[in-house]
Amino acid sequence: MNIDDKLEGLFLKCGGIDEMQSSRAMVVMGGVSGQSTVSGELQESVLQDRSMPHQEILAADEVLQESEMRQQDMISHDELMVHEETVKNDEEQMETHERLPQGLQYALNVPISVKQEITFTDVSEQLMRDKKQIREPVDLQKKKKRKQRSPAKILTINEDGSLGLKTPKSHVCEHCNAAFRTNYHLQRHVFIHTGEKPFQCSQCDMRFIQKYLLQRHEKIHTGEKPFRCDECGMRFIQKYHMERHKRTHSGEKPYQCEYCLQYFSRTDRVLKHKRMCHENHDKKLNRCAIKGGLLTSEEDSGFSTSPKDNSLPKKKRQKTEKKSSGMDKESSLDKSDLKKDKNDYLPLYSSSTKVKDEYMVAEYAVEMPHSSVGGSHLEDASGEIHPPKLVLKKINSKRSLKQPLEQNQTISPLSTYEESKVSKYAFELVDKQALLDSEGNADIDQVDNLQEGPSKPVHSSTNYDDAMQFLKKKRYLQAASNNSREYALNVGTIASQPSVTQAAVASVIDESTTASILDSQALNVEIKSNHDKNVIPDEVLQTLLDHYSHKANGQHEISFSVADTEVTSSISINSSEVPEVTQSENVGSSSQASSSDKANMLQEYSKFLQQALDRTSQNDAYLNSPSLNFVTDNQTLPNQPAFSSIDKQVYATMPINSFRSGMNSPLRTTPDKSHFGLIVGDSQHSFPFSGDETNHASATSTQDFLDQVTSQKKAEAQPVHQAYQMSSFEQPFRAPYHGSRAGIATQFSTANGQVNLRGPGTSAEFPEFPLVNVNDNRAGMTSSPDATTGQTFG
């Protein structure tokens, strides 16, 4: 077999004759057609001279593989992608086969002028393609059937000229418009909306949307953990958990915060970091930006920012305000002064809901300033007076706190407070000697005007039931009186200080409650109790507490009269700590009174003392009748009258439990704000107790006074029900009654130490006799009628 037969048989396998003829015309790919034209005689002569053994044809396969490797290096990846996606139909393949140089094997060793890149490469490609073309007809039909569906990815050209892959998603969810490539993925997604979970665990009845989720869950029950850490040997159900765990050993932190560029090893920690640090921080920045804009606008307009609108801490804000300007410094000082004043006067105006035994008046010393009420009269009266001082003692859960209150130059700082605040402790400060010198002067009206401001009624109080507990339970007082128990409301305990007025109102009250004087226009005074006195038995107190514990809070509208009501507020005059003071002081303003009026008042007051002495000696006869019980704190008290007040409409009283002594509070109020009004007589005006004037014309001795009292006692037909009016008690009459505790007379020393006073049957017949103050020297008491301004004991 010659070489021609071998070559002819080889090319017949690779392609048809028409293909070989067409391929001969396209031998040259480089476009040089003139050089590629070779005569057939020359080719045939060359092929005859040289024979091509079969081994050379087999070696062409190795050349083909090497050429393909070089060709892949020369062709870029993008060109290969374009070639794979775009050249896929039969027509393009047929055209490619037609362009391939089929007849190039005849000119392998012929020195013709062709470009170098197409000599052996094209021959190798042709040989390889000829081998693949043998099995192409059957495989090509199968591939056509598989590719009839839409491709997973489509090669596209972006706007910038780059190549991109587009995935067609023709299956759209009806619920959320999500698109999927296949219907299987769509149906699996729809389970999320419908809540259907077709895959159920056989052991714990948990259900899952996908099967692989169920298989992963079942590993929990079986304990299978196929993934193991190489370093520590820990095993995991999921591969993701193992990979996440390995980052703890390697220290790898692939996740970065986009705000602070901090790295984390887990995604959940990145999310937590963003939520905790950056989201809240952004909100704060927005708030600060808004407030900063407001601050800038306020600074431009000349206003300062309030502390609540500033995001800086309080200390830094104060430093900034101090460094800003002098105006800011002044404003900060004003704010601090206001805050201090508010804290100082807070005990005086505590609300009605905080009346529960909070502030007790420990000591109250009054020193009148030069610019006090009365103008030049007060200035001329004394040159040693100073601004008044008030020391309040706070008693709250075994803690004591003293808060000094520095009074300003006015008569009372209490008048500057708001009308809506409750006047729990309102002390009006009046210098007695100054008022004595300025008695009858029109300037005294200024005091009344100033005192009307802070006085406000105490509305619903939690201590009202405590204040009224003895009112409706008369048998408790009677039982205590028969057992020689003492109930006293002391007015006195005046220390000797030059130009200083000190008064005290001590109330026998329960330790857990506040002394409440519940008038409709009253002021409340809390008095410290004296724990040395044994007043009421514990069983009586427990019974009272049990009885009144069910009452609702609130103020009760109850009117009282002397005829059917027993007065439990007892007033006595305590002079145990009263030294001799030669200068008599007058506390309580009174209008001009003539000598005849004073004489009448003296006569009526003498009758009143006679009745008091008579009831002292015959105390047991009046205990069983509705009467006014006035109890002295000791059987050795001096001969000083004890008074109580009953308002015409509203009864004001104090719960009596323990005696609180040593309490000094000068009190002076207006007639419409009365606490203790002693209603004895037919007068419609309030007659305050006041010290008599400096000049005393009467020189009556003590024996004459006692004789007069005895004669009046005999002439009295009904001493118990007789109404008396208070009259001026001159200095000589008071002289026997202002001794020390050692020299106490025995007029008030009875079996049970009580003085019972009973007024007329109807309360309308009783005017007010308010008790204003007690002189330091206990020289006596004088009251003058005042038709316009009656003073009460507040």
Swiss-Prot record:
Modified residues (N6-acetyllysine): 607
A cellular component term, taken from the record's GO annotations: nucleus
Phosphothreonine modified-residue sites: 194
Keyword Calcium (UniProt): no
GO molecular-function terms, A-Z: DNA-binding transcription factor activity; RNA polymerase II cis-regulatory region sequence-specific DNA binding; zinc ion binding
Annotated signal peptide: none
Pfam families, per database record: zf-C2H2
Covalent crosslink: Glycyl lysine isopeptide (Lys-Gly) (interchain with G-Cter in SUMO1): 356
Residue spans, zinc finger C2H2-type: 171-193, 199-221, 227-249, 255-278
Chain segments carrying region Disordered: 298-338, 575-596, 775-794
Principal location listed in the UniProt entry: nucleus
PTM sites of type Phosphoserine: 51, 250, 301, 306, 412, 665, 784
Record SMART domains: ZnF_C2H2
Compartment(s) of residence: Nucleus
Feature: compositional bias, Basic and acidic residues: 321-338
Feature: compositional bias, Polar residues: 575-588
Function in brief: Involved in transcriptional regulation. Represses the transcription of a number of genes including gastrin, stromelysin and enolase. Binds to the G-rich box in the enhancer region of these genes.
Description of how the protein assembles with itself and partners: Interacts with HNRNPDL. Interacts with the 5FMC complex; the interaction requires association with CHTOP. Interacts with CAVIN1.
PANTHER family (UniProt xref): C2H2-TYPE DOMAIN-CONTAINING PROTEIN-RELATED, FINGER PUTATIVE TRANSCRIPTION FACTOR FAMILY-RELATED
Name of the featured protein: Zinc finger protein 148
Organism: Bos taurus
